[in-house]
Amino acid sequence: MGKQQPISQRKLLGVAGLGWLFDAMDVGILSFIIAALHVEWNLSPEEMKWIGSVNSIGMAAGAFLFGLLADRIGRKKVFIITLLCFSIGSGISAFVTSLSAFLILRFVIGMGLGGELPVASTLVSEAVVPEKRGRVIVLLESFWAVGWLAAALISYFVIPSFGWQAALLLTALTAFYALYLRTSLPDSPKYESLSAKKRSMWENVKSVWARQYIRPTVMLSIVWFCVVFSYYGMFLWLPSVMLLKGFSMIQSFEYVLLMTLAQLPGYFSAAWLIEKAGRKWILVVYLIGTAGSAYFFGTADSLSLLLTAGVLLSFFNLGAWGVLYAYTPEQYPTAIRATGSGTTAAFGRIGGIFGPLLVGTLAARHISFSVIFSIFCIAILLAVACILIMGKETKQTELE
């Protein structure tokens, strides 16, 4: 078989972005399905918390294992494998009738979701010139907002009328996209030209924690943990929080859809600023905005304040995610880039395990949401401190 022709940056962004969109759509739909299962299966907050956390356990395992595999067999192959993993798993989960079976499948789906994100960002970052790399990666991450919007629309129109099973079957259709990727997507040119492909996975893991890279690895691991801990604690529970505050399921879905709309301007503003002010400082500013919004969302005592804080939370938090995905691969050379991105993202997914567990546990004990969201506020501020102390600027640096 002949070598595939190079792909334009715009087409690569669209191709990888669609994979990112499907990933976000699955995660977004899960937040609405948790709320639906709360009603249909009469789940308690203690049971609800495990759905999001098991998903994050799978994402942690997937981010680490598929990151290692991407440095061994290539970015493209792993991108396709992870896409098939979560799309087929979602389709099968539409037919389960017990929480235990649903949880097992959410672990498998989570592995695909967790593996796809760092591999896709690595693939794109290696194909873009330094002057545009940060902006393109943030724009790649903006597909996450479109996926969440699609999830909110599907949940609003499909779940109340046709059930949560129909929503999951729709996400399974993304498996067909893998067939397109197999023939249209070339692998990373930097990976293809790499002479160190025969390095063992263990050698790559050791290199990530070697003296030369331990500072960015520790910094990114802490930041990813705090950001993902807060994100999944807050966003997976948004529809359920609205339900627990007394709104109907339809009202809850409407309000979360409104909040989700703010994600796109958050991404676009970060994409515009990242090549002007740099990764480090834009990340700090957007995380501070996230912390403040989380605090006011938790303490809101009126619908208008709740929606305003929710919109700002979406704007700042998802903008920060975009910058973090641009910032992470730039810390490592090509030989260990996917391993480094996957390893630090795996620490983040561990945070994603504890976030939903924390909310479910505290909500079951009738702890106020002002206290719960204050905890997330503090976690985000810890990430800010870590970046300020240990982070370096990587704006427009040439990738090794």
UniProtKB/Swiss-Prot annotation:
GO terms for molecular function: transmembrane transporter activity. Signal peptide: none annotated. The chain crosses the membrane at residues 15-35, 50-70, 78-98, 99-119, 143-163, 166-186, 218-238, 254-274, 281-301, 305-325, 344-364, 371-391. PANTHER family: CARBOXYLIC ACID TRANSPORTER PROTEIN HOMOLOG (PTHR23508:SF10). It holds the Pfam family MFS_1. Residues 36-49, 164-165, 239-253, 302-304, 365-370 are extracellular. It comes from the Bacteria. The keyword Repeat does not apply. It is found in: Cell membrane. It is a multi-pass membrane protein. This is Putative niacin/nicotinamide transporter NiaP. Belongs to the major facilitator superfamily. Sugar transporter (TC 2.A.1.1) family. GO terms for cellular component: plasma membrane. Residues 1-14, 71-77, 120-142, 187-217, 275-280, 326-343, 392-400 are cytoplasmic. Probably involved in the uptake of amidated and deamidated forms of niacin. Increases the growth rate of E.coli that is unable to make niacin de novo; confers increased sensitivity to the toxic niacin analog 6-amino-nicotinamide to wild-type E.coli. There is probably another mechanism for niacin uptake. Disruption phenotype: Partially reduces sensitivity to the toxic niacin analog 6-amino-nicotinamide. Keywords: Cell membrane, Membrane, Transmembrane, Transmembrane helix, Transport. The keyword Plastid does not apply.
